[in-house]
């Protein structure tokens, strides 16, 4: 729980059975499967592997460290990842926190990791609880988060 990793393109990775993750990634319609755990599709056929294509895309550099050390701070946004494709922060709300998006030319996505809260903006509000995801449109300049919750905050910078 609460582990964070930044796995750049070209790094072979796998997700084990029973793991729940938030996989935030750049826009892409490409996945190269080098192994598929002997799974089959809805017709009982093995899914296609892309081993030859993958070899050209894999980063074989040794000693790559992907884990992100972070310590959430109450009513603050703590950066986890900032890259050319997206920014991801963790936000722990206790009580009330106002977030300004005026300098941001992007939507914001909040994923509720724990707890529940109410998101309030000039023309409305929305409640969210653990496991839910909320898309905040780019036209909202400011939002107040009220409650007790831990969130992922994702946007394009």
Regions found by a protein language model. Name each.
Residues 1-6, 121-140:
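Short acidic-glycine-tyrosine-enriched beta hairpin
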